[in-house]
Every structure is written in C-alpha cells, then in structure tokens.
C-alpha cells in the first residue's frame, strides 16, 4: 500500500540533495590544478564535469518544492511569519556566517564581497564591480530572495492563484533570459541575477501546490513524472553546449528534468519501490549537503595548493591523476568539515528550535 506523497519527513529527499551536491562538487573538483594534456578518457571526464551545474538547478527545484510546502502547510497559523523566518535563520545563518569569517581571515574573498554576501547580495557582486568572490554564494542569495518574498504571496493567495503564478514564473524567467541575448549585456548576468533563476524555484513551487490541490490524485503525477524527466533530459542534451541555449532554454529543460526526477523520487519513496531510492551514500551526502555546498570550494583550493607544492613534477606528467587526486582530496576534506559543521554547529542551532514552544521545526529534512 502506498504512503502519502507528502509526509512530515521524506527521507528520499536526502537522496535528491546528495545527488545535487555531488554534481556541484563534480563540477568544481575536476578543475585541473596543474598544466598538462589530458588523455581521451580524461578529456571526456572533464567535459562531463562542466555540466555539474545542473546540481544547482536541482537544488532550486527542491528548494521551491520544500519551502512552498512548508508555507502552505502552516499558513493558517498566527505565528506563520515568525515561525518561518526564525526557522530559516537557524538553518542558514550559523554555517554561512562561519564561512564568511573564514574567508575574511584567510583572504580568499575580498572584504567587499564578504559584506554583500552578509546581506545576501552576492549575486549582484559583478554589477557592483566587486571582484575576488566565492562562487557558490550567488545561488544562496537567489534562494534567500525567494524566501524573503514568497511567504507573503503564499499567505495571501488561493491555491489556484498560486498555481497560475508559478506557471507564469516558470515561463517568464527563461523569457527574460532570451531577451537578454538581444541586449549588449554580459551573459553572466543571466547566470547570477535572481529574476533569471526563478524558473526552477517556480517549478518546484508548482509541484508543491499541485500536490495539495483538492482535485489532485496520485495517478496524475505518476502519468507525467517520468515523461517530464525524459523530455527535459533529452531537450537538455540537445540544447547544452550551444552558447545561446546554455543561458536560456537549456536551464529550463534541466529544471523540467529535475522536477520530473523529484516527482519520480517522491512516488517511489512513498510506495513499495522505496528501496530503489534508499541509497545510504546519497542520504549521507544529503544530510551534510548544506555545509558541503558552502565549504567545498575552499577544500578544493587547499587540495590544489597541496598538490602543486608536493606533487607538481610527477603530476604534470599525468594530468588525469592530478585531476582525480584533486577531486578525491578535496571531497574527503570537504566531507569531513561539512560533517563536523552539521554535528557541532548547525545542529546546535537547530536544537534551539526543537526545544522552543514558539518555533516548531520538522525533523532534519531542511533545504
């Protein structure tokens, strides 16, 4: 017998988180720390890693789904806003501000960048002329802008109006990216600005709203989940690599595939097939995904320095080994730090919420 799709704790979503964060690590970890000519296999591996950015889009879809669901399920509460924003602050700020402190002490990011990141404006650093940034914080800023505005909209609108609005968001964001191509504006704007990255969040929100519509039936999702994943995946493969498509429709195709994958995971995780989405290794990385996402660039930087200092000569002769050592070394270091962060820092603040009668927190299935 099937369980409800929406439950207080959905362990299969940790698998989705784990896959998403490992894709991002694959992108940054395969960057060559040393010079040299790659073998054919190494070149294929490196080229594949350049599409690890799809993990960010998967995170956006998952975040839109979870946050919208949390808001919908609590919007009748008198403490709706206070509960949500305190919970978000307890989840996000401690690890983020700890990272910003490390970046300031080590000088790995400029003080102006750290200042705008403190205010969740890292995705506008380029517009402000700020250099020497820390890559991953742009996406965190996009999500925070969503968190700041979306609760007010969810509170006021009916499910039907919200469904219409999310469709407009899903279609409108790629339309803005297409308009960008006809204007003499640097393409990185399309990668980082909030309004160019809303289709993933909107599609995740749409899924959360649809699953809560009175007329929704499980069979409806079962009919569209796999086709959406396959259609989005095929479209992404066809579009990816074309300069005009990478910043426009390829992202939308990726978001559609991500929403289909998320839907398939929800269906399997609440059915007799749940063993097929119960992958302990991905659940572990999902458990530490937030800290891992924050710290991994710093960890890969350390791995690159160590390789360049101690193994520069032999690894120059074998750049594939250099690339793999860079990835594995950074992954191990980032995983260790992220696990310590989760256990000793993040959960310390989460327990504040658990023990408070004013703020109720779900089990640790956070974005």
Label the predicted regions.
Residues 100, 147-156, 160-161, 168:
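Hydrophobic, aromatic-rich transmembrane alpha-helices
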């Amino acid at each position: 017998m099937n369980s409800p799709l929406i439950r207080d704790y959905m362990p299969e979503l940790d698998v989705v988180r784990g896959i998403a964060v490992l894709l991002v690590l694959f992108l940054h970890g395969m960057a060559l720390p040393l010079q040299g000519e790659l073998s054919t296999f190494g070149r294929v591996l490196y080229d594949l890693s350049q599409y690890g950015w799809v993990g960010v889009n998967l995170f956006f879809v998952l975040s839109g789904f979870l946050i919208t669901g949390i808001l919908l399920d609590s919007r009748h509460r008198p403490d709706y806003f206070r509960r949500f924003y305190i919970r978000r602050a307890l989840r996000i700020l401690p690890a983020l501000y700890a990272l910003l402190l490390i970046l300031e002490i080590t000088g790995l990011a400029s003080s102006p960048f750290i200042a705008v990141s403190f205010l969740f404006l890292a995705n506008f650093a380029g517009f402000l002329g700020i250099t020497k940034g820390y890559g991953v914080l742009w996406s965190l800023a996009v999500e925070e802008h969503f968190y700041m505005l979306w609760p007010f909209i969810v509170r006021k609108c009916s499910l039907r109006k919200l469904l219409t609005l999310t469709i407009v968001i899903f279609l409108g964001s790629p339309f803005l990216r297409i308009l960008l191509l006809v204007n003499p504006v640097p393409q990185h704007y399309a990668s980082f600005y909030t309004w160019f990255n809303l289709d993933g969040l909107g599609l995740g929100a749409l899924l959360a709203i649809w699953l809560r519509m009175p007329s929704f039936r499980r069979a409806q999702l079962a009919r569209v989940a796999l086709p959406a994943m396959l259609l989005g995946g095929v479209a992404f493969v066809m579009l990816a690599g074309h300069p005009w498509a990478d910043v426009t429709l390829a992202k939308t195709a990726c978001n559609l595939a991500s929403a289909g994958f998320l839907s398939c995971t929800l269906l399997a995780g609440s059915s007799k097939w749940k063993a097929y989405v119960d992958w302990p290794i991905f659940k572990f990385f999902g458990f530490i995904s937030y800290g891992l996402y924050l710290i991994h660039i710093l960890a890969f930087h350390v791995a690159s320095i160590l390789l360049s200092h101690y193994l520069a000569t032999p690894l120059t002769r074998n750049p594939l080994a250099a690339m793999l050592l860079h990835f594995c070394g950074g992954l191990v270091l980032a995983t260790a730090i992220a696990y310590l962060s989760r256990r000793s820092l993040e959960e310390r603040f989460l327990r504040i919420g658990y023990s408070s009668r004013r703020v109720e927190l779900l089990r640790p299935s956070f974005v």
